[in-house]
């Protein structure tokens, strides 16, 4: 429990009573749930010791709305990554497509380890978590070999 207490506020999961008398220590005090939509709960979310109230697997965040994919660009923020979504926009005058992209800030739960720039992530929409974050990482796929910069998954 001491390894999660790295900020001033006491870290604990909502709905877990830490003061119970008859606790089976084999199972431990950990709440996790399945988010549905065909996504599996990661092993680290079940057996880990991290506390993250914005995690869709161990926190009180529901995934509803859009499911998108993107490529990880930056990992410089704490528990937040920037992904790039490439798409084609049609120009009617020239009867051609042009390449465009959007960068999105996405919450990355600590249950996903070894995420690097270039990996493909699947994200799901949730309630606003901050000023710019409205999506949560649901699945991580390791990057393929050498790919072109602009690619439609």
Curated annotation (Swiss-Prot):
It comes from the Eukaryota. The keyword tRNA processing does not apply. The gene is RpS11. Keywords: Ribonucleoprotein, Ribosomal protein, RNA-binding, rRNA-binding. One of its GO terms (cellular component) is cytosolic small ribosomal subunit. One of its GO terms (biological process) is translation. NCBIfam families: uS17_arch. This is Small ribosomal subunit protein uS17. Belongs to the universal ribosomal protein uS17 family. It holds the Pfam family Ribosomal_S17. CDD domains: Ribosomal_uS17. SUPFAM superfamilies: Nucleic acid-binding proteins (SSF50249). InterPro entries: NA-bd_OB-fold, Ribosomal_uS17, Ribosomal_uS17_arc/euk, Ribosomal_uS17_CS, Ribosomal_uS17_N. It comes from Anopheles gambiae (African malaria mosquito). The keyword Nucleus does not apply. One of its GO terms (molecular function) is structural constituent of ribosome.
